[in-house]
Amino acid sequence: MTLASAYLSPTAAGDLTEFATQYPASGEHWDKVDDDPFVAHDFDATYVGDVSSGSNKEDLYNLGSLPVGVGAISYIRVYCIVKANNSSITRTANISIKTGGTIYYGTSFYPNSAYNTETETWTTNPQTGLAWTIAEVNALQAGMRINGSVIIPVLTWSVTQIYVLVVFTLLEGLVGTVWQETTKLHWIDENGAEQSKEG
């Protein structure tokens, strides 16, 4: 059994677009957090965000699809690169996913004043309790919720990157890490050389 991985970045808006801020102001929220997982995120060059006051605020994003060659899915892990204008042990946020029409939340986390990587792992689909299927992952939405708070001072949150790592069993004939770049499938062969073809 050979384990492989794919990274899925936002490709379109999901079912919630509640954050009040995006920078730059042009374009869409999803294209502010779609930095290539193989390249360092762009910090404050592009981001979305909101403040931790009043009601909860949440953005969800549709993601790219899995490449060919995916067998059994071991787990998904959502990555969120986030900061607030001050550190806090009272204001929180959650990584979120939407599957089968229902939103599920990861463990609450506190912000740092510098960009920090938050992660949440789901080994099974929380709706079914079973291993993820290809169709479920391809329909997945991922994002983040800022939890409302009446505590002063108000925190301003910024999110610069969100993506999903999918770890799976590689189908026979493909060895090593597999990933998608536009419409092209890349993989590492048994000699350690990168190969590619249209997916």
Language-model region placement:
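Disulfide-rich extracellular domains of secreted proteins
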Residues: 1-172
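Viral virion structural and adsorption modules
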Residues: 172-199
